[in-house]
Amino acid sequence: MLTKITFFERFEPGILSGAKTITLRDEAESHVFAGQILPVSTFEADRWFCDIEVIDIVPVLFSALTEQHAAQENMTLPELRRVIQEIYPGLEQLFQIRFCLVQ
């Protein structure tokens, strides 16, 4: 089970503003549960910047990603597809973790 979660620094403003409300992860990073509070750090420097609460987690296929997923990720669908392919090249099975910022 995850006890913390990391994001690339470029996603920090979207998380803190509430514009980014989901993250797409592979199975290794899918072991969370609704109601879980996770400290959030930057991937690059492991710098804590907030806590999030997991709302839910659902499986989603890369080929089934929509504009709604992209909006929840605070980017366009082409951007989302590119980013996912950079992080998880060739991976079809993803897990959507929906979260909210803990104030």
Curated annotation (Swiss-Prot):
Signal peptide: none annotated. Pfam families: ASCH (PF04266). Its EC number is 3.5.1.135. Keywords: Hydrolase. InterPro entries: AC4CH (IPR008314), ASCH_domain (IPR007374), PUA-like_sf (IPR015947). Residues 6-92 form the ASCH domain. GO terms for molecular function: hydrolase activity, acting on carbon-nitrogen (but not peptide) bonds, in linear amidines; N4-acetylcytidine amidohydrolase activity. This is N(4)-acetylcytidine amidohydrolase. It comes from Shewanella sp. (strain MR-7). The lineage of its organism: Bacteria, Pseudomonadati, Pseudomonadota, Gammaproteobacteria, Alteromonadales.
